[in-house]
Amino acid sequence: DQTNPLAELRHKRTLSALGPGGLRRERAGFDVRDVHHSHYGRICPIETPEGPNIGLIGRLASFARVNEYGFIETPYRRVRKVMQPDDPELVGCALREDIKDPETGELIAKKETRIDAKLVKKIQQLKLKEVLIIPYVSETTEYLSADVEDRFVIAQANTPLNEHSEFVRTRISTRYHSKFDFSSRDSIDFMDVAPHQIVGISAALIPFLEHDDANRALMGSNMQAQAVPLLTPDIPAVSTGMEYHAAMDSGQVVIAEEDGEVTSVTGNRIVLHTSSGDKVYQLRKYQRSNQSTCIDQRPAVVKGQRVHRGDVIADSSSTEGGELALGQNVTVAFLSWEGANFEDAIVISEKLVQDDDFTSVHIEKYEVESRDTRLGPEEITRDIPNVGEDAIKDLDDTGIIRIGAEVGPNDILVGKISPKGEKELTPEERLLRAIFGEKSRDVKDTSLRMPHGERGKVVDVKVFTREDNADLSAGVDMMVRVSVAQRRKITAG
């Protein structure tokens, strides 16, 4: 699925319970399809198809990964409560209880004292096995699978912390197994890494997702993947911060592989001067995606600009400034309009149509093959019987349309003639025809033409011959593929 960068990304993150060794749609009950507490941070509870596959096909959550055994893991920040006296991270922590000399009973440090390097030395001299500290959230993350996670008490990502990463409150909202509860800070083992850890990429792109009904959020996250790339992408005015990551991870934007300076920028390539020499990045121009949408990369840098490794140097369809830009920022009014917006209908301004705000480019491919038939070989040619000069004005000498030609319904893209006749040719007749090239033979026009109602501009022509492509299907001598780009304005329906 390549409708837009998000569709491509979520296609690659799909999980299915169907197929060999899996379930059958008809046999899968409600229990299998329902959301389970082990999905938390692993499988998105929102992104799933509506229909017979609901709950059987899912998407990976934002931070989930698959481990070496095939189990899905999710990251958590470790909460540290006990430390070894020789731990370098002990400096800056606060004591959970008084420290006394085990031999004399002398008070070394009071409870809640902030540990410094001097106190660490004293503690190490006491030869204590461990030091109890006020729990703090460390920077180390650990990936846990569902069965391991069930053993721990986990705090929410938005739990307030002080400047020392310690819990501000004594009672904290936590999760243990499938129960949500309030726990003391001493019993917490881990903390979520981010609030959107629970949802997938598409759902994480919806602002204020927590205020939406789950059913409508499901529709919204699925419909984002159906958005066709527009002529002028527009970054959302209200974003969630996931737009950059979604665009980068989709693989459609061009990223600088090294630090360097831009020495040349043209429509179809960018040259970067780096410490290891000049690096040329070729851009994809007007390429057809699997869904017939247009993949067109545009430079996002200017000549002389310094770029760093990992910077976006070229945008693709539905991205702007290296961020995902699926739609347009428009003013929406919530009111009745003489019944024209009854139920799920909407009224849009004519200005949006005139300004091409919602205009998209679609590229269709048309193919024709010349075969060796029983009556003789078909031929791709400009010499087509009973066709006026006007119909073949854009064809080259070989009978193939030129790039840049405007075509409409029933226009010839590739001229082709096929032999017609009731009888099969004998080998002798074939030989004579090959030698003398009998022009007056009986042929019919089997040219490739534009379908009814279709029009556009030819953006690419590819010719495949038997000599260059041995994998052409049997009996095919030559194949021509013509790509036609079409601008489509937003229309009713």
Task: Enumerate the predicted regions with their spans.
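Intrinsically disordered, low-complexity regulatory segments
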Residues: 1-493
